[in-house]
């Protein structure tokens, strides 16, 4: 099987579609060569990671400043006033008709226009890492789109959120922890924060689910980083539903002491509605949630928007759910089009715990969720594709449920580590993993025959990603395909419609989610999800998750022997280009690795078969036929003859078991005989004792169970984002402790006078905390910049800006350049 080193050679396009793209790019380059110069340069998308200047190593490069006024952004403003043209339907071989397409909604009705969050009113010191600002990751350069700060500051609007207004008659009871209210039919409430919801009377809708009266209590997470869930009364007794909201103390809010990304994302000061329901309680009383009538009620003045569903989305969800257990749908579309939101709504709708839904479908077998998006997975940390079996609706963003281990909501049936946030790094391995997960779903159907399937495909929908998507449509035996963009482009919609027609399944085209501004970039949300994953736990006997605010450096690690008679790690694999064994220690130390259970000694993919999705020099460049991938059996790489043990090289100095097979780049593990248990942070490599110190949320019982089954464990170092959030945790924790001590002294001064605040013990504690901050600021790979120069103030201002998603189409295509 050829790996990436062999794929890197120049080759002809793989299909007519790729050939057209190459000709379009050549024509675009020719046109650019004769175009007269313009005063305003066209700026390229940002690099994958910000780099420091050689002259000023501690100040992060700010490519955003050079990119905020582009011709594309100005052209987009002009085109926003125009009515969107519908994408032409695919014409070849009469593909099926897509659902009726309507113009996009105006971006002023965006569902996720959020503002940044900073906990402190004062500006904190800027923390800079070797790749940029720690905790505020640099923007990512994706093939299908990129994120950049907004061209101009977005003004805070008095945006309506709740239709209902609380009064004495609508409040059933309330205290400092809970409140029970009546909501009239077709009226809604919006809250920010996190809370437990109990439907006592009537029926309410929430994030696609219809919740009926029962003893079930649902945990809801509603941060400002995402659009806020809307609680709407669908029907009720005497036209009203009765719902109780209760504060919950999961500890997730404590993560603000470890990362600025978690600061000011929950509720602020009590709103007018809160004060009404807190009458008779101390003035300092505050719940973990707040009722918002409009965005102006927010004390932090953030750009809050309700999570309303498009009418076309509602119709599509109702139509898809009518298929019941026969539903097997692939949801795809460009980056930022709302695939994850639509998938979450459809999932919750299918899991609505009603005795009988409007579609006469009674769900007792749960829902299978096949997540093929390694960059923004829903129920797992980044870099993984997995099959989950859900039994209960889930209300919250991905960082509120980064793992299903021990969860009552569902389980992970099987997971595979891709080792990157995009499948384009190794599409062959990606497709093999998807095929194995689909086989696991078919096996799951033996026990749950009425279990529908939702497949979430990543935003990698152009070029080779389109080849993979169309192959999946033809091969997986689906019932439906949903494409999340009415704007095309034609180069995507036409092949996708053709594949759906050949598979005899309908293609539904829906409007994308009208999101223009968000308060966290994709890279920042990945950091938040990773940090949440490593700090989350589920103690026995507790239904909901808990988060620990202790930095990972103070967490007791697993100590695993990598050599000797008690060896627990069979090998260490580094995905991508081969490295010299002498460098393995440096590559491994302080990195994120996948803990993979290997079920066979012959678990490495061989090299005897060519790649499934690589450019082929002998491929046809004309005609309308793409690469023939319909016979998947011929395309599956065979297992090599070498075993894992025979492929291990011991490093000369540390005796680390370096596992490498391949020509130039590492062959991955075969998904059919391996699966991922989770991620771990390598805290240190103890050469003297031949041990690795691993910090991981994987339980000891899980690891013991794998070893008792006779499986071995391999650590896989992929191409994931560096754990900068973990490096800076001690510094932010020290700052938070010093702030709490400072507030205590100020309170003592106010209550007991200056003399009480000048106690020797308090002064000693103050010095200890300052020393802790000093020591925490001197860790490797991190620099604290304390000056208040103009460039630092500008960097802090960029940190507060909103992020705008820009999507790119092919040059010379029928679609808009920035759409």
Swiss-Prot record:
Keywords: ATP-binding, Kinase, Nucleotide-binding, Nucleus, rRNA processing, Transferase. One of its GO terms (biological process) is rRNA processing. The keyword Transferase applies. InterPro entries: Clp1/Grc3, CLP1_P, P-loop_NTPase. One of its GO terms (cellular component) is nucleolus. Pfam families: CLP1_P (PF16575). It comes from the Eukaryota. Residues 8-42 have a biased composition (Low complexity). Its EC number is 2.7.1.-. Residues 115-125 have a biased composition (Acidic residues). ATP binds at residues 333-340. Residues 76-94, 101-112 have a biased composition (Basic and acidic residues). GO terms for molecular function: ATP binding; polynucleotide 5'-hydroxyl-kinase activity. The keyword Transferase applies. Residues 1-129 are annotated as: Disordered. It is found in: Nucleus, Nucleolus. Belongs to the Clp1 family. NOL9/GRC3 subfamily. Polynucleotide 5'-kinase involved in rRNA processing. This is Polynucleotide 5'-hydroxyl-kinase grc3. It comes from Aspergillus niger (strain ATCC MYA-4892 / CBS 513.88 / FGSC A1513).
């Amino acid at each position: 099987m050829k790996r990436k080193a062999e794929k890197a050679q120049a080759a002809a396009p793989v299909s007519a579609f790729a050939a057209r793209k190459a000709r379009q790019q050549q024509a675009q380059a020719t046109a650019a060569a004769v175009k007269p110069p313009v005063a305003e340069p066209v700026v390229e998308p940002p690099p994958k990671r910000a780099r420091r200047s050689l002259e000023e190593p501690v100040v992060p490069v700010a490519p955003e400043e050079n990119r905020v006024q582009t011709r594309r952004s100005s052209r987009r403003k002009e085109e926003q006033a125009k009515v969107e043209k519908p994408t032409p339907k695919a014409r070849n071989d009469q593909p099926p008709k897509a659902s009726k397409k309507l113009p996009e909604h105006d971006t002023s009705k965006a569902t996720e226009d959020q503002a940044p969050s900073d906990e402190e009113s004062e500006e904190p010191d800027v923390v800079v890492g070797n790749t940029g600002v720690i905790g505020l990751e640099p923007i990512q350069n994706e093939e299908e789109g990129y994120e950049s700060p907004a061209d101009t500051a977005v003004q805070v609007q008095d945006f309506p959120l709740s239709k209902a207004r609380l009064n004495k008659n609508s409040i059933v009871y309330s205290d400092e922890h809970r409140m029970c209210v009546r909501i009239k039919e077709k009226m809604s409430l919006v809250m920010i924060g996190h809370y437990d919801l109990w439907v006592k009377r009537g029926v309410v809708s929430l994030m696609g689910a219809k919740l009926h009266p029962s003893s079930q209590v649902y945990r809801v997470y509603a941060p400002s980083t995402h659009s806020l869930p809307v609680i709407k009364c669908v029907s009720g007794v005497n036209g009203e539903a009765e719902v109780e909201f209760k504060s919950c103390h999961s500890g997730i809010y404590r993560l603000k002491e470890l990362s600025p990304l978690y600061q000011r994302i929950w509720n602020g000061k009590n709103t007018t509605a809160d004060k009404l329901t807190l009458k008779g309680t101390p003035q300092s009383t505050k719940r973990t949630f707040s009722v918002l009538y409009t965005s102006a009620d927010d004390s932090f003045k953030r750009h809050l928007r309700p999570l309303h569903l498009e009418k076309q989305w509602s119709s599509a969800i109702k139509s898809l759910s009518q298929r019941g257990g026969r539903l097997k749908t692939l949801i795809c579309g460009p980056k930022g089009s709302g695939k994850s939101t639509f998938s979450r709504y459809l999932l919750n709708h299918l899991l609505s715990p009603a005795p009988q839904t409007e579609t006469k479908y009674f769900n007792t077998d749960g829902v299978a969720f096949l997540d093929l998006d390694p960059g923004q997975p829903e129920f797992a940390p980044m870099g993984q594709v997995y099959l989950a079996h859900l039994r209960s609706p889930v209300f919250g963003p991905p960082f509120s449920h980064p793992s299903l281990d021990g969860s009552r909501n569902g389980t992970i049936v099987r997971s595979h580590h891709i080792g990157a946030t995009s499948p384009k790094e190794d599409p062959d391995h990606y497709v093999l993993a998807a095929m194995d997960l689909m086989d696991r779903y078919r096996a799951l159907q033996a026990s749950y025959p009425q279990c529908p399937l939702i497949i979430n495909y990543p935003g990698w929908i152009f070029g080779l990603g389109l080849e993979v998507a169309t192959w999946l449509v033809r091969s997986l035996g689906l019932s439906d395909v949903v494409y999340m963009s009415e704007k095309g482009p034609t180069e995507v919609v036409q092949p996708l419609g053709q594949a759906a027609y050949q598979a005899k399944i309908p293609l539904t085209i829906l409007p994308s989610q009208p999101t223009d501004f968000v308060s966290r970039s994709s890279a920042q949300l990945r950091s938040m999800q990773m940090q949440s994953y490593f700090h989350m736990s589920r103690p026995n006997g507790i239904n909901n998750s808990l988060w620990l605010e202790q930095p990972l450096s103070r967490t007791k690690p697993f100590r695993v022997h990598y050599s000797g008679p008690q060896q627990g790690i069979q090998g260490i694999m580094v995905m991508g280009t081969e490295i010299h064994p002498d460098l393995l220690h440096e590559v491994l130390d302080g990195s994120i690795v996948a803990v993979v259970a290997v079920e066979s000694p012959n678990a490495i993919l061989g090299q005897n078969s060519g790649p499934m999705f690589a450019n082929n020099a002998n491929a046809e460049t004309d005609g309308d036929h793409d690469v023939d991938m319909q016979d998947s059996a011929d395309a599956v790489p065979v297992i090599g003859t070498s075993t894992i043990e025979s492929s291990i090289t011991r490093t000369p100095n540390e005796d680390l078991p370096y596992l490498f097979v391949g020509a130039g780049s590492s062959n991955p593990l075969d998904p059919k005989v391996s699966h991922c248990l989770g991620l771990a942070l390598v805290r240190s490599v103890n050469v003297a004792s031949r041990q690795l110190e691993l910090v991981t949320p994987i339980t000891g019982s899980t690891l013991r169970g794998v070893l008792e089954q006779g499986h071995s464990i391999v650590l896989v170092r992929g191409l994931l984002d560096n754990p900068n959030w973990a490096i800076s945790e001690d510094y932010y924790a020290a700052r938070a402790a010093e702030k709490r001590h400072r507030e205590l002294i100020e309170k003592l001064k106010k209550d007991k006078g200056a003399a009480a605040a000048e106690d020797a013990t308090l002064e000693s504690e103050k010095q200890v905390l300052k020393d802790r901050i000093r020591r925490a600021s001197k860790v490797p790979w991190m620099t604290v910049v304390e000056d208040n120069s103009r460039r630092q103030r500008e960097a802090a201002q960029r940190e507060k800006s909103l992020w705008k998603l820009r999507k790119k189409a092919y040059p010379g295509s029928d679609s808009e350049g920035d759409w």
